[in-house]
């Protein structure tokens, strides 16, 4: 099953469930100015981060994927530093120790960084973690004024529509009837 189609279906179904729950609870819709934030977060956290991450792991080993995913907090430190904000030395040390721990656990996969066949997957995964970091920082800055879970559902729904457009335009889909059972189980999970 095409990875982006899997992501689009998973986010669509998850978004529908979240949004339906909050509509049933009569949660007020976000205000007009909040939709810009929701749209930006949809693109950063779901279309780019989740979509590119899922696409990227098709081209790399799982251990390398774990190492690349663990780079996410380091991006936070780097971005925060260049914004002129301060992080405590303890926080930075903790992130580096955790990243080092992941590298120790997946030590055998460090050599995969040198594998030419993995270059595309590495690039996709790095962009995914970088957009995840920007999305996280943007969430911290902008998203506190409305229900984060309702926003999450809307982000999932909006991002799935973007992804359906992309996979439709690129022809990277298969009919729903041809999706294997294990893919449906992973979507449900």
Where do the model's predicted regions map?
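Transmembrane alpha-helical segments that form core, pore/gating elements
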Residues: 3, 18, 76-82, 95, ...
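Specific alpha-helical transmembrane segments that line the substrate/conduction pathway
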Residues: 5-16, 45, 50-89, 128
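Membrane-interface helix-cap regions at the ends of transmembrane helices
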Residues: 13-31, 100-115, 158-183
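Hydrophobic transmembrane alpha-helices of multi-pass small-molecule transport proteins
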Residues: 18, 39, 71, 87-109, ...
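Residues that mark transmembrane-helix kinks and helix-interface sites
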Residues: 19, 50-54, 74-77, 106, ...
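Specific transmembrane alpha-helical segments of multi-pass solute transporters/efflux pumps
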Residues: 19-69, 104, 185
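Cytoplasmic-side transmembrane-helix entry/capping segments in multi-pass membrane proteins
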Residues: 33-42, 87-100, 121-122, 146-156
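Residue-level signature of transmembrane alpha-helical cores of multipass secondary-active transporters
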Residues: 38-42, 54, 66, 95, ...
């Amino acid at each position: 099953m095409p990875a982006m189609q899997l992501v689009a279906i998973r986010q669509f179904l998850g978004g529908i469930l979240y949004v339906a729950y909050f509509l049933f609870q009569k949660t007020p819709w976000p205000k007009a100015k909040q939709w810009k934030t929701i749209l930006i977060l949809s693109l950063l956290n779901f279309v780019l981060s989740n979509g590119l991450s899922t696409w990227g792991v098709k081209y790399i080993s799982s251990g390398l994927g774990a190492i690349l995913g663990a780079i996410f907090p380091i991006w936070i430190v780097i971005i925060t530093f260049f914004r002129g904000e301060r992080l405590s030395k303890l926080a930075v040390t903790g992130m580096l120790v955790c990243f080092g721990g992941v590298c120790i656990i997946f030590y055998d996969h460090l050599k995969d960084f040198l594998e030419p066949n993995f270059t595309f997957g590495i690039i996709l995964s790095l962009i995914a973690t970088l957009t995840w970091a920007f999305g996280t920082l943007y969430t911290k800055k902008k998203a506190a004024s409305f229900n984060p879970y309702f926003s999450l559902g809307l982000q999932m729904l909006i991002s799935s529509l973007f992804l359906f457009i992309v996979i439709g335009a690129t022809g990277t889909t298969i009919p729903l009837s041809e999706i294997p059972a294990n893919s449906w189980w992973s979507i449900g999970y």
